[in-house]
UniProtKB/Swiss-Prot annotation:
Membrane-crossing residue ranges in chain numbering: 7-31
Name of the protein: Co-chaperone protein DjlA
Membrane topology: Single-pass type III membrane protein
Annotated ranges, domain J: 207-273
Gene symbol of the encoding locus: djlA
Cytoplasmic compartment segments: 32-273
Amino acid sequence: MHYWGKLLGLIFGVVSGAGFWGIVIGLFIGHMLDRASVRGNQGFFANNQSRQLLFFSSTFQVMGHITKSKGRVTETDIRLASQLMERMQLHGQARIAAQQAFREGKEPNFPLRETLRQLRRACFGRSDLIRMFLEIQLQAAFSDGQLHPNERTVLFIIADELGISRNQFEQFLAMMEGGRNFGDGGEWQQRQYGGYQKAAQGPTLADACKVLGVREKDDATTIKRAYRRLMSEHHPDKLVAKGLPPEMMEIAKQKAQSIQAAYDLIKKEKGFK
């Protein structure tokens, strides 16, 4: 409800001692403040919706570009992209839009750097959104169980254009590798015979520490701090409010579950609550 401006204007008019006209002027000023507030909120939602649309299209365009970087796009690549869309629960028009964006990214003249620069401008001041974008691309690159040298090169370009240092990128890469045993984009691995099965080896303490970006020798305070920071950065509702498309909320939830599972394993192995 947008009446706080009028209420404050009324109070100002009364306490000003200017009588009837003081109250009228106060109400008028308050009315203008309320209108400005409404326009500001409309602008926020319009900008946020635009940011979500750009994030959505850029995600699948860049994903298609990464896939194409290996050379020919195989049926397996397309199937893996479809599986990722299933994880996002994309159906109907949303799925058609994702498929079209994926095809655009495969084009030889796809403007990768300009696309990333537009995304970075749209996500200015929202580092957790940028991080989520990179994590989704890492999941896509790792979806077949391996990272092709050309995929790594494209990922370096992505990190560079999004303002992520090489050291930060390597940390994200290690966290992604550790998270694969926690169902974080790597629950299913391709074998040479073309089938898919769950990784036989269960997650280890080393894997869990990679997910949280900590060392096995770190104390409980350091580990808890890293856990809380990551959970805050991957909170689905917060990410959507900042511009993550609602269709991608499921990936954020799965990432948060992976972080939680890793933290629970560390607590169990190191014996703290």
